[in-house]
Amino acid sequence: MTYLIAFAIIFLLAVVVIQIGKLSELSARIRGEEAEERSVNNTQGMALVAFMVVFLIACVWSAWAYKDQMLGYGPLTSASAHGFELDHIFNVTLFFTGIVFIITHILLFWYSYKYRKVNNTDKAMFFAHDTKLEMIWTVVPAVVMTYLVANGLIAWNNIFPTLGPDSKHIEIEATGYQFAWDIRYPGADGKLGNKDFRLIDPANNSLGVDWKDEASVDDIILGGSDKIVLPKDSTIKVRITAKDVLHNFYLPHFRVKMDAVPGLPTSFIFTPVKTTKEFREQLSKFPEWQVPADPADPTGPKKWETFEYELACAELCGKGHYSMRRIVEVVEREEFDTWLASQKPFYVTNIRGKEYDPWAGKKLFPFEIKARANELKSDIANYLSDTTGTASRNIQLKHVFYATGSADLNSDLSKYELDHLVELMAKYPSLKVELAGHTDNVGDAASNQVLSNSRAGNVLSYLLSKGVNSGRLSAKGYGQDQPLESNDSAEGRQANRRTELRIISK
């Protein structure tokens, strides 16, 4: 129905225009062609001058009235170090193009009036060549363009400095795809691992990260809805790429904008200089940000209180283009370090211990050893300090490994957790524990009982060899009788093959 009404309106307007044209022709015949033409020319000339005045005033007024809603003006000053320089370049460019804009429009409409046809003897002036005029419109734009380009090159070099291995910067990676961004942070080593598109597995490795590269195993990957967190006053280098179509990595408040092209990695370097909290306080000083964020809830939070930095895709990439918006939060460096330390590496949560883990049974990484040591220390301390009886006395030794199908202890990998257990036993001299061995239900129950006994005994022998008093230790195998998970799946059977620390007395 809406389309039908719109079509009818357009049709009626066309009829009106045609009828006005016919009336003009009829009027010209009655009044005389020359007089009518002179009248029309005068009317149009004056109308064009009036339009020029109204148009230029409207342009200047609207620019001034809405300046606080444009990037670079009012409260929307740059939130990055380089952004101030870019805003200055835009202002300089606006100054020169504004002069051309105003002069061009004044001449355009004034000449339309001045050189309107008044008499049949009037003729347009024509000249084929004017050296002075050609020099002016060649040299002046060339000088202005040279100045603008030179300033742009200087700014470009300032924005993209050479970052060496000793540069104290944070390198992250943004991968665009329909319709989200995956953001990868380096772990404790400060390095992003390698990627290879041939390793992409939509179910388990959507970025194609090479897990054989040790720099990859502590990398942190944020999914499509996780908040992106950045530190204030720290240099950030963003690797930008895409998996499917052309995207664009756009952080408007930081003056960051770079295409994300499949197969062609790009990058951008910037330094945030205002936290999200500081930018909100800046916005709060302007009346247009003091209105309710939700007009339907006048008593709710103000607009400035709900402000968030954002990452957008500035390339029309498909019907879900709008959903690529991500929240960006800038915090102080200490808060960022705390947040980053709380994030678990993708490898640990999604790859470690699976059949496609290239390091299974081969290596423990420093961040794993440290995290497990803290976890074991916390578990024991929580039980010893518990007065409610809710803390579990059973603590799984997650980094104790054996040869497949054997009771032989893999000392190279198990030593880290067991040595830390020795330290905790020394810290708590009254602590007595039982080492409990468990298996899955593969094979017969009697063999599993023997295997679990032997494995628990080998752990006990290791602890004794490190000087732990034998009176504080005991070992027992429980075979397949106490499963944690169902033995119907490989993951369940793996969870049931374990060694536990059972606290007997505090």
Name every feature range the model reports, one short phrase each.
Residues M1-D68:
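Transmembrane alpha-helices
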Residues E33-V40, I57-L94, G98-V100, H105-F367:
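Non-transmembrane, membrane-proximal soluble domains of secreted or membrane proteins
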Residues K132, E305, Y309, S414-E417, ...:
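Stable alpha-helical elements in mature extracytoplasmic
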Residues P141, A174, V238, Y402, ...:
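Conserved hydrophobic/aromatic pocket- or pore-lining residues that grip, position, or stack substrates
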Residues I240, C317-G320, L340, V422-M425, ...:
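Sec/Tat-exported extracytoplasmic proteins
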Residues G353-K432, K506:
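Periplasmic peptidoglycan-binding/tethering modules of Gram-negative envelope proteins
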Residues T404-Y416, A426, K432-K506:
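Periplasmic OmpA-like peptidoglycan-binding domain that tethers envelope proteins to the cell wall
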